[in-house]
């Protein structure tokens, strides 16, 4: 894609973040700064694609944008998993999930965001009070008879996260 077309595409998505009541003021301010910056590198990297699940899960640098880890991308992924669980386990009396996290920046916030979205979708949530290692989370899913679980872990190569 030509650079100007890519910039225009990214600016269009960024504008939707700036103009929607769905996003908090701090996020909107950061996005506005990217749009107004003559150097479009950060804007492009933040909005040129949507984070996708890979072998390591949902991975990315923290910050505003569709290609970043933030409460909005975590929320969208959680809503997708909620939809899947409600569709595929609709005959169960109660669908349940385990939500865990580690000590990285915003990990607890992301875990609470996910827990709230699961709950809003009628899914019972077992949210660990504190950080836990992945094997403990895996054990909890089986021990509690949950249909799924998510663990918000540090996986970004960025030292700023």
Spans of model-derived segments:
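Short, well-ordered strand-loop elements centered on a beta-strand within folded domains, enriched
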Residues: 10-13, 17, 156
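Short hydrophobic/aromatic residue motifs in ordered secondary structure
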Residues: 57-59, 127, 161
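Secondary-structure boundary motif
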Residues: 87-91, 143, 161
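An N-terminal, well-structured beta->alpha segment
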Residues: 15-114
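N-terminal small/polar loop signature for handling phosphorylated ligands or for N-terminal nucleophile
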Residues: 98-152
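Conserved small/polar residues in nucleotide/adenosyl-binding loops
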Residues: 154-161
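Eukaryotic, polar/proline-rich low-complexity intrinsically disordered regions
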Residues: 8-11, 24
């Amino acid at each position: 894609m030509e650079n100007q077309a890519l910039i225009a595409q990214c600016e269009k998505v960024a504008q939707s973040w700036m103009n929607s009541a769905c996003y908090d003021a701090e996020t909107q301010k950061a996005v506005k700064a990217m749009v107004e910056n003559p150097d479009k590198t950060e804007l492009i990297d933040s909005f040129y694609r949507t984070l996708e699940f890979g072998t390591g899960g949902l991975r990315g640098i923290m910050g505003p944008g569709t290609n970043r880890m933030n409460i909005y991308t975590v929320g969208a992924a959680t809503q997708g998993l909620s939809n899947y669980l409600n569709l595929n386990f609709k005959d169960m009396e109660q669908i349940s999930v385990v939500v865990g996290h580690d000590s990285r920046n915003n990990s607890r916030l992301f875990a609470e965001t996910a827990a709230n979205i699961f709950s809003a979708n009628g899914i019972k949530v077992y949210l660990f009070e504190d950080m836990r290692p992945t094997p403990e989370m895996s054990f909890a899913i089986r021990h509690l008879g949950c249909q799924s679980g998510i663990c918000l872990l540090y996986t970004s190569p960025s030292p700023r996260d």
